[in-house]
Amino acid sequence: MDALPLVQTDAGQRLVGHLLRHHRRYLSGAIDPDVRFRDFQNHVVHVDEGYWGGAPRVAHQWYDRMLRYLRTDRFSDAAHAAGVLSHYFTDPMQPLHTHSCDLEAVIHRPLEWSILQSYESILADWKSDDMRVVFRLSDRSEWLGEAVLHGARFANHKLARLLA
């Protein structure tokens, strides 16, 4: 939801309106991959293991589903699909979702809990940082998968610092 103010196109603003109107469905969709689907192999892109993981594929599936719902005026369902999509899109941007090892398994939950507890501070720091990462999305049909893979590669560069 924090990214919604960054949306700039008219079509994007219409989608933002639907997401805000159906925010409960959006938010429930955002946690469904963890609590309902529990398909954790689809939350990752292991960069150093030949890009193993299903995040790009499943993100495309939920994106297509969201578009189908939008075209048929099923805006509540579209908001839910957008929430699910947001999970599969952002999880590979967490460095520990880009590699698997024994140490990663030990620190994963505590790190995610710490991020959750510090989220407001992290967001404020990001907003005030002139060096923050904002990437533009392509108009090409492959844009979504490319963005997920790019995010995973970027996150993977931060992995060694977390595991040190």
Please annotate each region the language model reported.
Residues 90-94:
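Short active-site segment of divalent metal-dependent hydrolases/proteases
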Residues 83:
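Active-site nucleophile-His-acid catalytic modules used for acyl/amide transfer and hydrolysis
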Residues 87:
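Divalent metal-coordination and catalytic microenvironments
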Residues 1-80, 95-164:
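N-terminal, motif-rich segments that launch catalysis or mediate targeting to/interaction with membranes
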